[in-house]
Amino acid sequence: MNVMQENQIKLIEHIKQAVVQAVGLEEAEVPEILLEVPKDKKHGDYSTNIAMQLARVAKKAPRQIAESIVPELKKDNKLIKEVEIAGPGFINFYLDNAYLTDLVPVILTEDKQYGESDFGKGEKFQIEFVSANPTGDLHLGHARGAAIGDSLANIMKMAGFDVSREYYINDAGNQINNLVLSAEARYFEALGLDSEFPEDGYRGADIISLGKDLAAKYGDKYVHTSEEERRSVFRVDALAFETGKLRADLEEFRVSFDEWFSETSLYEENKVLPALERLRENGYIYEQDGATWLRTTDFEDDKDRVLIKSDGSYTYFLPDIAYHLNKLERGFDVLIDIWGADHHGYIPRMRAAIEALGYSPNQLEVEIIQLVHLFEDGVQVKMSKRTGKSVTMRDLIEEVGLDATRYFFAMRSSDTHMNFDMSLAKSTSNDNPVYYVQYAHARISSILRSGKEQGLEVTKDADMSLLQTEAEYDLLKVLGEFADVVAEAATKRAPHRIVRYLNDLASSFHRFYNSNKVLDMDNLEVTKARLALIKTAQITLRNGLTLLGVSAPEKM
């Protein structure tokens, strides 16, 4: 718990005691006291609506109640500088800013751990994201999902949740058969033999390369073997080739997974039919028209869903149910699935299946990744200049850089359509959000280097009481909000709140820097305090950028 949180608790307790004295309630009768940070600093550091909450109990107007509470609030509290009543009965608090300087040694000590909390209390979450078919390159939707999923996992972990990242490999569907047939055709082609290319095959350059690899590895060994034997071998090689590309691209994007879960393993380990039997035992399966159905309408789905078709083949829904049952049986409290925009209609049926299995539907959360449109110089970009095909994640990283790609994808809520401005992402100006934040970090690093060259090291023993200007206090207030912002971003599943915070922090630092001289050799004690202050800003900027998978450069 940091200084800001401790003072919030002290303030809430002080308000409670004031209510007891002014209104005549027992402590247990006082409703929950909520503190809000006013958007306009003119309205104080904190505000509470407790007087409005008490109106019915006290049988008085909220403002009249507030007027009775305020005198009690002003008694014996060094934390509060001023209290005022606003509007119909809001109580605004102006705190004595001197307490803020206690933050500096705390942040310096916690360093990379600054921002961590036990807010999540170790609750076990699994976040499954990206999960692209292993049949080609990652597109922009996958890239946005990767950035948001990884950032969310980082944020929730810092907020005290136990988080596992998982990639579901769709390696059991018809698309894999097409991949194998495509690889087979390119294998024959690489050996100079005629082969009919499958109608729905994959024609990318990567499959041509795979065919050459197979020819180099096996020669003509599989030319005359049975189709079954050849395709069984090529299936393993093709999947290894494609998943290897996915892993490499994601690792370059600074995204890693704790588990790569194969759909095929559900069949190999007999996980599918037991899931069906559990649904049957729970009374939600019926047979109709030769097919096997799940009665999802019992759980607010708009129609029942087929699990096994009349020809005996499974729909996609059945293995998906088995997979989610497997996740829950692994002990996760909550599952977060991050899906593409085209899966929005899939949510009600999957939540229904979770409930039909005997779990709470609230144990499944789904975050939808909306579409991404690229723009450059105001013109929409649909094709890669390099390949003449759809722009891939790899293309975008090469064009605007890894940091800009990660940061820009985290800037907007995942459920909003995104226009990605490539020109802005490449610009080296303060209009570029990621440049603006990284430049603040680099500028601080430069000042600290200059101080070190003059024999001035950052120390926790500096006299922090010398930090007294409004810009210093404003910067400290923003620094003190970091852990709360992380917890809020975790709770709301909203990485974009970290982006917003970093922009606010960079702005606060730049305002401080423009109005306060840091390196003043004629005033060494103030200089030492300000060096310590900007070091805390550097630490917090770095920690926030790290959550988003973005680097914190020392020089720019």
Curated annotation (Swiss-Prot):
Top-level taxon of the source organism: Bacteria
GO function terms (MF aspect): arginine-tRNA ligase activity; ATP binding
Family to which this protein belongs: Belongs to the class-I aminoacyl-tRNA synthetase family.
Compartment(s) of residence: Cytoplasm
GO cellular component terms attached to this protein's record: cytoplasm
EC class: ligase
Keyword ATP-binding set for record: yes
PANTHER family (alphabetical): ARGININE--TRNA LIGASE, CYTOPLASMIC (PTHR11956:SF5), ARGINYL-TRNA SYNTHETASE (PTHR11956)
Chain positions of motif 'HIGH' region: 132-142
One Pfam family, short name: tRNA-synt_1d
Name the record gives this protein: Arginine--tRNA ligase
Keyword Lipid biosynthesis recorded: no
Subunit structure: Monomer.
